[in-house]
Amino acid sequence: MGVKKKREMQVAALTVCHQDMETLRSFADMEGKNLASLLLHCVQLTDGVSQIHSIKQIVPLLEKVDKNGVCDPAIQSCLDILAGIYFSLTLKNPLKKVLASSLNGLPEVFLTQATHSFTFHLQEELDTADLYSYRKVMDNISSCMENFNLGRASVVNLLKDVLHFLQKSLIEILEENRKFAGNRIVQTQLMSDLLVGVRVAMTLVQKVQGPQGSLWNDSSSPIWQSMCGLLSIFTKFLNDDDLLQTVESTSGLAVILFIKTMFRPSEKLPGLISSLLLRSAECTSIPEWLMNSCRSLCCTDVPASTLLFLCQGTLAMLDWQDGSMGPSGEALLLDIVHVLFTLSSQIKESTLDMFLSRILASWTSSAIQILESGSSGLKGHLNGDSCVPRRLLEYVYTHWEHPLDALRHQTKVMFRNLLQMHRLTMEGADLATDPFCLELTKSLLQLEWHIKGKYACLGCLVETLGIEHILAIDKTIPSQILEVMGDQSLVPYASDLLETMFKNHKSHLKSQTVTNTWMDKWHETWVFPVLSVLCGGNLDQRSYVIDYYLPRILNYSPESLHYMVHILQASTDTGTGSCNHRGALGALMACLRTARAHGHLQSATQAWENLVCSARVKQGLIHQHCQVRIDTLGLLCESNRSTEVVSTEEMQWVQFFITYNLNSQSPGVRQQICSLLKKLFCRIQESSQVLYKLEQRKSTPDSENGSIREQPSVTLQQYKNFMSSVCNILFEALFPGSSYSTRFSALTILGSVAEVFPDPEGNIQTVYQLSHDIDAGRYQILMECFTSTFEEVKTLAFDLLMKLSSVTAGQFQDSEKLQDLFQAALELSTSTKPYDCVTASYLLNLLIRQDALPAVLSASSPQQLTRGAGETSAVLERNTLVVIKCLMENLEDEISQAENSLLQAASSFPMYGRVHCITRAFQRLPLNDLRLASEWRPLLGRLLLLSYRLSTVVAPVIQSSSPEGLIPVDTDSASASRLQLILNEIQPRDTNDYFNHTKILKECDSFDLEDLSTSVSNIDSSAEVKGKEEKACDVTAQMVLACCWRSMKEVALLLGTLCQLLPVQPGPESSNVFLTVQQVKEIGDYFKQHLLQSRHRGAFELAYTGFVKLTEILNRCSNVSLQKLPEQWLRSVLEEIKGSDPSSKLCATRRSAGIPFYIQALLASEPKKSRMDLLKITMRELISLALSADDSKGRVPQVHALNILRALFRDTRLGENIIPYVAGGAKAAILGFTSPVWAVRNSSTLLFSSLITRVFGVKRGKDEVSKTNRMTGREFFSRFPELYPFLLKQLETVASTVDSELGEPDRHPGMFLLLLVLERLYPSPMDGTSSALSLAPFVPFIIRCGRSPIYRSREMAARALVPFIMIDQIPSTLCALLNSLPNSTDQCFRQNHIHGTLLQVFHLLQAYITDCRHRTNADFLQELSDVTACTKAKLWLAMRQNPCLVTRAVYIDILFLLTNCLDRPEEGKQTALESLGFWEDVRRIILESELIKGFPWTFKVPGLPQYLQSLTKLAIPEVWASLAEAKGQATAVPLSFSRLLKSSFPEVRLLALDTLLERARSSEQEQKEPLPLLCSMGEELLLLAMKEDHPGCFCRVLKILYHLNPSEWLPQTECYAHLSPKEFLMWSMDIASNDRSEIQGVALKLASKIIAYRVQSCEKNKDSLAPELRQWVQLVVWSCGDHLPTASRLAVAEVLTSTAPLFLTSPQPILELQGTLSLWRCVLTLLQSEEQTVREAATEIVTTAMSQGNTCQSTEFAFCQVDASIALTLALAVLCDLLQQWDQLEPGLPILLGWLLEEGDDLEGHVQSPHQGEEEHIFEKSEVNFWAETLTFVKSLCRQLFHLLCQSGWQSPHSQKLCHLQRIASEQSHLISQLFRELPLSAEFLKTVEYTRLRIQEERTLAVLRLLACLEGKEGLRAEDCPREWRQVMAPRTEAAC
């Protein structure tokens, strides 16, 4: 990029009339030195900027004129002309302000004459009668009052006339506005004029009030009458809801200002305004003039908005400073806030909410002003403990989570001002000890961190009280805040609070400490927690900390960088990180990157030399964790200086990075890589410009020595070489078969190169030009990118080709090639593969833009199209027109054929491809600048007709109510007859009998056109697939459906694109009209028909896209008839929905199909700044219909209304405008759920789900109700007050019926939705004592809902109860619930009641235990003792006295919770709980349970599995306790793990095994000896493994054995399992090869551990293990197969990681070479897996393999966590090194060459039958590879083999295997050449799959032949002999790690 040009100021030049010009000429002197000459010269200039300089010379010229010049007629005329010029200029023209500024310095002698001139011209302005010129006059009045003495004087002179004009103009504009009701564009302009008029009147009164104050007091003067008239107008505006709210709010300001100006005595003004606001004014006490002007404000009820704007005016227009209004002013201030509090409960519209919050914030500022003036009267009212601040706090707490950011900001302002008010009332007291502040701090800290308002308020407290006070309460607060920074929605708030805190803390420490030791404390508090997060936090948390927090702390304390580096460097060796954690290396790179980007590192050299070594940088560039790689790249690329020179090391590292990171799977990572590299390229370009200038200066004769002179040129050459090398890598990455991510990255980076280094213009030098590195081969590579199945790749390639236009032009010289390309594009445009038409559109657009159409096509264009052919835009338009005509001709023929046979069209020429190409051609045209209008008009008319014809052909399938994709064929006559009813509904245009009669097929699922042709006479050879294929294409349902809905989709998009040719003028004679009004209406009718009647979602979703474009344009259209169309369409469809006419074609199923989309499009396009009248009308109608229970019209209108409401509540474009209707929607959903009609219930459920998401947000947490998706009851019911009585009443009704007889359990299904809402509400600790919207009334009803006969409802009631109970009320609630349970002696009780109550106890107790961890031990244990005592009283519920297993299970779960949080009594100590006999009771329950005494039931008993699980969970801790008491002695215990494992119930065995597995796993991880218990259980485990038939238990047994040392149990297999160790191994391998995935993986790991143990324990007799080893290797290879689940491949990776030192890298190979290489091939296969988890696991194998003693020198990345992309190369490097160590080159090389060649690949079969299965999978183009790239593996292997041969100097003996490979490779090369010749022209586009496969195999074959050629007869190989594409990415292995 070159130096940016400074933007030139554009100023419109002033002009004068002819008469004034003649006047100036007549007075101008010959020398041109008088004022007339100066003005004449000025007006003759055409440049406004030059005129500004002339105007500035006027006053200096007049200052030189003597006093006699006053009478000079020339000067008088000139001043008059200047006045005329001033009033002729527009308000925004800079000339106007310059002229006013200059004339302010006019000599005094000329002021009188000038004032007269300005007054005269202002009078002319005021006499204007044209309503549409009023705005200009108002602007002139406003500018006269704006720092312009002459203007103000002229306004004062004409004050009466000015006021009269304002009064007249406002009345007339308001009347005009009413006339244009419905025309939004005109109304918006008129209301803008009204707003300006009101503001001008206010300015006038404020500016003139001083010098003309007496004018306002004379009630008989015309000025007074005008003032009263204006006041009356403002009052009318204030009450007019049809005006914009800005007009209303400004009128409120004006009303108060005028009353303040006119009312006398002023001392009574506060009382008057107070009476108006409180609606307490007496008509008799109000002055007559005020009553006449503001009667509606004085004597009638006024809307809430009017009161709100009057409060705003009062606060803004009265003088609150210095307490000048006295006690009455203070009383008024308090009255205002009470009015505002009242309004806050009434106002629900979001815009008024916003006004209210601003006004309340303004009120707090006014209160502070009065308090600062020393007022004592308000101190009692504004102290923190008084009523007003408490109400303000409630407002803050209610709204601090509001969806509107601006409103949340106002709550922060209010809170800060409230603290300031409290401080002022305290008169210097210490706030740190103030009870109000202490209570506020405590309550805020108790809140959960997901509440956004907490952060802002805490920040205000820190600013007021200081951070020390808060840290003293809880010093872990910094860590707590960092913990929540994983949530993106909280990150900005958290980082702001942290910044406030650490700044305050540093200032405090600095002021308190003399020495520098305070810095260590500050680092420990604020920096060290950040480093902990960077090293080990979760991914989102780390990213957000780096982006939001780290820059702030470094910017504030740059010296902390050295502390960070010191800490991280010390831990880098032990914390390199992994795929899941960054480690210290990642944290180090993040800190350095941030520091450099923000200028805290002076240069890159400083970083490399002093802070981090180069080896660390290189490790970071290929680290397994993507963010570490990004941060390291950012460290290299980012700099705060855009011209900083890029060092040689940086360029080398970037080149290294690009080589291995193009194939990133994460879109976010790819975007960051491309963005960072673009920054680097910009740095290179910018610094190169500096270097060029430096070089030019150094080349002068007086320059310094030569070494300095050549330095810039050396760097520039390095830049050029670097850029060329980067582009080489990028182009080589676009090889055949490269993945989507590689192509995307490479093309994006190449596009950045082309953008940053454009072709030079003029004298600008550029260091690199991409076009110089583009040859024909690379151009072809870019063209082949069009064949990608991903459109992003096509777009990037197209854009890049456009940037290389100079190169592109040279590639289209061959006319034959052009013809082939164009023909290929046409053929692709009618392909049955949907993505082919996209390729066709790109090819056609490329040919169009390069003026490269075939000669035959160009010759057919009319002569007049050649005009302007030299211009790019003209060429583009001409070529587009020609291509569209060509496509339309083909489309017309195809539509005609489709009208005869839709089947033939679907199979041979689906028409949507043609339409797609036409649409894409239009989209790349500048539709607002078409020149060939006479050609376009008839073409567009014809195109519209074609679109409608096509739509008519495919509509029967799309609009059918039959199942989507139906083709009316079947295999038997009975089924076929049932289809006839559906067929009768379809009215197609096919002339054959396809849609008229069902067909019976013979043993096939598709319908062959040849079969059809035998029975239908008018189908002949046209039934064959276009393209002269040998076999006719079977037509599947998918093909017909795809043809139809894609055709509808493309027609919709085309029409939407054509709508951009609007705006339309009504007259057809206009030259730039392309669409007539009638055509636009037809397009709208088309969309209406298909949106309202289409059944197929794919069709109406895309029709919606096109319709949205139309409605958006219509709403902006100046044509009134078109502008009103959306409203007409909306009212029409609402009437049709309400009518419920049986003949209506509206779809009542499929969620009303396209109807919601239709209404969405009409409403979403309504201007957001309007009053949203259409939305209001629609929502009222729909909610009324949704709530309607009238069965007389059926339920169809209600279903439609519910479905449409659901769509509207989901539409984010409606924003806060939809919120006022949430309450109505919720009522409709809850009531609709009780409907007896299924369709209503279904639609109600969907609507309810949308409302929950709209109100509570998208679910982010894993739990059912995440904390971030909850809301306090106060906030919820404040926003939706109607729902409070509704929900309470509904819940009361439901709760009163839960005890109904069992025969009617579902009488109130609405309970389900009620509880779903209520479980998302919770009481806030900040709610205070206010009970107006308390949640307490809901609690008894929720508890009662727990008695529901429906299990699910009882569970929901239990969960819903938890958030309603405050944490300190839970113990008492638990006791009350437990006491309500029946006693064992009670005769009559219901188990449903017991179960519901126990569930509530369980969930409450669980929440209490979780939240009470931070409470003092004494309180917690005492409360828990009370709960335990109540629980113990109902112990019979856990015994056999209770026959219900379900309730027994829940009671036991409660006991389990209690046992978990209570410590067992130790010997010699007796706790309070022990005295209760709690532990004895628990033990008694277990010992008397069925676990000991046996089970009398079967699985048919309800609740048995649940009971068994609960009982076992309670028993297992008791088993451990018994074992601990026994202390290893062989004592008989009544319950043991052996007994549990022998249970006949899998639930019991499963839990026991899980416990043992957890202990075994922890022992292994901690590298401890296994527990004696586990060692002694070998017998039970082996027996269980042999006989276990439950998959889950069997899997866990195998896992336990795997985690135990085989030496502990393997020798016992013969005794207990009756299998020798060898047989047990074979048994485990057999399971691994036959069983299900999880078991298979565990068995494989177990077998691998056994075989490793046997190998290590049988060192002297390893040969005997050979058969087992071979079978194990085969099993591992088989387990890598793609046909197996991911778990299988992950198990293989784990196995190979653990056995790598033994089988992969052992200095003395244990396996045969073939077996060892097979395992290595498995590693390479896993590294190329499409699944990221598998690749990451495979990299662990490589890390282990290259970190052994004999391999750590093979690479420079030993012991490093590396990414899979480079792990492949490193694995091959280690393997080649091992072959050399093992001296196995001769037998190993043919095997590796065989990997290259892939022997056995049926190449010819793949190419000759490419369409196998094509009919069934029309959307699949080929095997899509998202990661694996065959040629990447080929290049890496070739590179390593060549390096190995060069390094070893190995001479190839004459090998039979190598000769065999030579022969196969040669034959394959010949076959490939032959197959290439058989492909058609442009095969890369027409036969992409086959072409790509051949290219890949060609590369593989050539690689083998090259290597074999190198081996033949060459004794010494050199590295430079290696092919460039292999050599370029060879990683050096010389640099040692740090």
From Swiss-Prot:
Belongs to the THADA family. One of its GO terms (cellular component) is endoplasmic reticulum. One of its GO terms (biological process) is negative regulation of endoplasmic reticulum calcium ion concentration. Keywords: Coiled coil, Phosphoprotein, tRNA processing. Residues 877-909 form a coiled coil. This is tRNA (32-2'-O)-methyltransferase regulator THADA. One of its GO terms (molecular function) is enzyme regulator activity. The lineage of its organism: Eukaryota, Metazoa, Chordata, Craniata, Vertebrata. The keyword Phosphoprotein applies. It comes from the Eukaryota. It comes from Mus musculus.
